[in-house]
Every structure is written in C-alpha cells, then in structure tokens.
Amino acid sequence: MKLLALAVLLLAVCSLEGAFVRRQAEEPNLQSLVSQYFQTMTDYGKDLVEKAKGPELQAQAKAYFEKTQEQLTPLVKKAGTDLINFLSNFMDLRTQPATQ
C-alpha cells in the first residue's frame, strides 16, 4: 500500500514539475511569428511570379483552357436546348387550359 501511495505521489510531483517547466519555457513572440509568416508568403509569391513568367506555364494554361472550352461547349449547348424545351413544355401546359 505504501508503495502504491509513493508511486502516486511520485507521479503527481513529476507531472507538476513538467507543468512548471512548460510555463517557464519562453513562448515565441507573436510579432516575430507574424513577420516570419509574411516573409514566407512574400518569398512564395516571388517564386510564383517567376514561374508564371515562363512561357511553359503560359502554354500549359492556354492548352488547359482550350481543352476545357472544347469539353464544355457541347454541354452548355445541350443544357440551353434542354432548358428551352423545358420552358416551352411548361408554357404549353399553361396555355392548354385557357384554349379549352
């Protein structure tokens, strides 16, 4: 029983000591964290601009947009036709009771 009490006491002291050490540890300054974040974002932006200047990326973007346009054009035309058919059917249903 004494051994169990001693183990619990030792565990409590160790956990309190760990909490005390954590409180004494110096926390990073908020201003330095923010400035580091902005510096990282600035560097990333500069790298991105340098990559975007290259003709390879512009050619890839142009090819992507052309491919997307080729794929979407038939879908948009079909959706427009379906919408017009739907609305015309809806309008026909409304005009039928009035003519009878």
Curated annotation (Swiss-Prot):
**Which protein is depicted?**
Apolipoprotein A-II
Major localization class: secreted
**The gene coding this protein:** APOA2
Q: Which GO terms describe its molecular function?
A: cholesterol transfer activity; high-density lipoprotein particle binding; lipid binding
- Give tissue specificity per the record: Plasma.
Instruction: Specify the superkingdom.
Output: Eukaryota
Give the signal sequence positions: 1-18
Taxonomy of origin reads: Eukaryota, Metazoa, Chordata, Craniata, Vertebrata
Role description: May stabilize HDL (high density lipoprotein) structure by its association with lipids, and affect the HDL metabolism.
Key words of the record: Cleavage on pair of basic residues, HDL, Lipid transport, Secreted, Signal, Transport
Q: To which protein family does this belong? A: Belongs to the apolipoprotein A2 family.
Residues spanning the membrane:
none
Oligomer status and interactors: Monomer. Interacts with NAXE and NDRG1.
The species this protein was found in: Odobenus rosmarus divergens (Pacific walrus)
Q: Name the GO cellular-component terms.
A: spherical high-density lipoprotein particle
